[in-house]
A protein has these predicted regions:
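Bacterial N-terminal signal peptides
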Residues: 8-17
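Hydrophobic/aromatic beta-strand elements that line small-molecule binding cavities or substrate pockets
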Residues: 34-36, 89-95, 117-125
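A mature extracytoplasmic/lumenal domain signature
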Residues: 49-51, 59, 85, 95-97, ...
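Bacterial N-terminal signal peptides that target proteins for export
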Residues: 1-9
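Glycine-rich portal/gate segments that line the openings of hydrophobic small-molecule binding cavities
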Residues: 66-113, 132, 167-177
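Hydrophobic ligand-binding cavity/cleft-lining segments
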Residues: 19-71
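Soluble non-cytosolic domains of exported or imported proteins
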Residues: 36-43, 49, 53, 113-114, ...
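A conserved amphipathic terminal alpha-helix motif
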Residues: 20-21, 132, 138-177
Length: 177
């Protein structure tokens, strides 16, 4: 009986230790949602957002967008964003719905402090001349250690994505109203 109890205790300790180690080295699941209401028809707003191969059409931080492989606006297209500061972001289009005015993408490589990043942008008609744009993302911070480097923690990751989305959406409103 004692051998069985000891074996059970040892097994439990081993499982708990393994779980603690796995948790220690994994970053939390993070999410960001930004929305903006624009006083313009949805078709006009979508016309600025629709071209996966030209994020700079509405996002002021993007100096250049290049389709590196695949076909623009088709699932699997890979784009390379060059930011104003010279940093780059490599992304893959995972879905595109022109009729539904939305697309989704993932980040493959980036200067941003995020990993396992997937995002979606939706343009929704509220009325004939009012549109809501919703940009959301799920991700983890790039530094998955228990003690991330300065500027690589959860707050930095979510703050960066909030700023990216807000900068793009604010400019989209400015150029379409």
């Amino acid at each position: 009986m004692n051998k069985l109890v000891n074996l059970t205790v040892l097994t439990s300790v081993a499982v708990l230790s393994a779980c603690a180690t796995m948790h220690k080295d994994s970053a939390a699941h993070l999410a960001v949602v930004e929305k903006i209401t624009i006083n313009a028809p949805a078709a006009k707003v979508w016309a600025k957002v629709a071209d996966y191969g030209d994020l700079g059409a509405f996002h002021p931080a993007v100096a250049k967008t290049e389709i590196k492989s695949g076909t623009n606006n088709l699932k699997g297209a890979v784009r390379l964003l060059t930011l104003g500061d010279g940093g780059t972001v490599n992304e893959t289009l995972t879905s595109y719905d022109a009729a539904g005015m939305s697309y989704s993408y993932i980040i493959n490589e980036s200067v941003l402090p995020v990993s396992h990043y997937s995002a979606k942008i939706d343009v929704n008609a509220i009325s004939a001349n009012v549109t809501e744009v919703v940009w959301n993302a799920d991700f983890a911070r790039k530094d998955s250690s228990a003690t991330p480097a300065k500027g690589q923690d959860d707050a930095a990751a979510t703050g960066t994505i909030h700023a990216v989305f807000k900068g793009g959406l604010d400019n989209l409103k400015k150029i379409t109203e």
